[in-house]
């Protein structure tokens, strides 16, 4: 089959070469963006006098018919026409005749595909921002329910200090708030129009790039045609931002997987977000959390893949850039699905408050409170740390906890101890007293909830 670009060729590629070089099996996802860009391009060609009114009307009518077919999923694509651009051009010519070939005036597939991806990512990033906000809303709701649910905070996966479970949930809210801000900021670099850059050097036709940018909703145009067709930093930024979101989700996945185990029993996932075993009848596996943790590696891989592709490319377009899309599509699907799953999973999970509270009483996470108690009475903190460490060792030897020690043992360690030490050892009191800004104290959590809600308003 003769290629639309085949004028200078005496031979056509072998079928397997066509199949290897074709991208239509994945870039067909850009069909609506490609048609949208073409409609704007046709309007501009008309405004600039390159197409007359009748030609422009006929072309746009044909494009709109193709758009309706695309929305109804009625378009049939062919490897013979390589990619989304040539497939749609062939369909347009079939629809309106040779006039369809005029649409490509003053345009290359190089600026065309870059325009498609800018349009695509603009829509997808806005959707992802909405999904992040929805998940944040659920985190705030869960936090509000558990402001006074006492929970062991960890360092090194060892119980460290008692905290509010709300404080833990809100930690992820603020991580996601930064993630959302990064996506919002990236829109400034996504909303740039490469349309009209041509293959690499612009065009001799009297086009109006600002006009097509306005029609397509872009904020401004690429100032350099070489840059406009050859860089993919806007995709790399998207993949990087997505990697950070997935990293944050993966950390929470790891905690959920631990928390719902028999060893912790801090939470129970709703049945709709767990699966069973084909062999072991008793199993309830946190598969969704495990899948998101695993899919994080896919997103990292997509970022590293495109970075590796880009690092050795001279200006401007190279066929290597055909490999920029599948990772982008995969990342969009992965991050959107992960956020939707997480929103439901956190919303429906059961928090075992009594188990959490018991965990803070059957450990030494209140040891810092004892050291602070002595320091507030004038003892150097390092000396207090040493004394409390020895008290913890005594407890370990006797199989008890600090709250079980007789008062005489405390006074033997230091005459600064008074009877109120047992109140200090209460995990609830320990949490309540953490009143520093950003801390786990209940008043601070209420302030944090107000700030979080303001961010979502």
Swiss-Prot record:
- Which EC numbers does the record give? 4.3.2.1
Q: Which InterPro entries match?
A: Arg_succ_lyase_C (IPR029419), Argininosuccinate_lyase (IPR009049), Fumarase/histidase_N (IPR024083), Fumarate_lyase_CS (IPR020557), Fumarate_lyase_fam (IPR000362), Fumarate_lyase_N (IPR022761), L-Aspartase-like (IPR008948)
Q: In which pathway does it act?
A: Amino-acid biosynthesis; L-arginine biosynthesis; L-arginine from L-ornithine and carbamoyl phosphate: step 3/3
Catalysed conversion reaction:
2-(N(omega)-L-arginino)succinate = fumarate + L-arginine
Molecular-function GO terms, alphabetical: argininosuccinate lyase activity
Query: Which GO terms of type biological process are on file?
Result: arginine biosynthetic process via ornithine; L-arginine biosynthetic process
Gene Ontology CC annotation, any one: cytosol
Q: Does the keyword Membrane apply?
A: no
Q: Where in the cell is it found?
A: Cytoplasm
Q: Which UniProt keywords apply?
A: Amino-acid biosynthesis, Arginine biosynthesis, Cytoplasm, Lyase
Q: Which family does it belong to?
A: Belongs to the lyase 1 family. Argininosuccinate lyase subfamily.
Per its record, how is this protein called by name?
A: Argininosuccinate lyase
User: What gene makes this protein?
Assistant: argH
